[in-house]
Amino acid sequence: MQLHIAHATINLQLPSSALEQIDVTNILSSGSVASAFDLTPPARGKYWAGQGGHYICTQPALLGLPARHVIFSSTEAKDLAFGPSVDVPGARSQLDGRRNTDALLSASRDHAAAKWASEYQADGHSDFHLPSRMDLLMAYVCAPSLFETSSWYWSSTQLSRNCAFVQDF
């Protein structure tokens, strides 16, 4: 059984006979399941064991998005094209990388960067996406040493049909 609760994935390995005896609704409503916000993050830029990557910062709730921990994968894809030259109005959010990535994938199956990010898995987490423009800015401010200084990093925030916002370090 796998539960996804407020940006935290919980994996339970139980025999199938035990599943019939568990009232998951009661467990969740009792508050006994810890969310990612009950965990203490490591120092900025350090690998967060069990969370799938390096902790960057905690973003407050902003413009309709919930508060969330920003975690970057420990693996980078090199030399991926951003995607085809297609205007994707749903990929213009400065803050919501998940929404942008989903929009890019919906608009084109040939979007190599969005496809790579959405298929990435680590520490049992499979909810990765391309970073938004704000996510990359926070990485620049909070953990620049994690990134190559000779490279530009694509965001999921599309600027035009031919370009997205990028960040250098």
Model segments located where?
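Short, compositionally biased
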Residues: 1-124
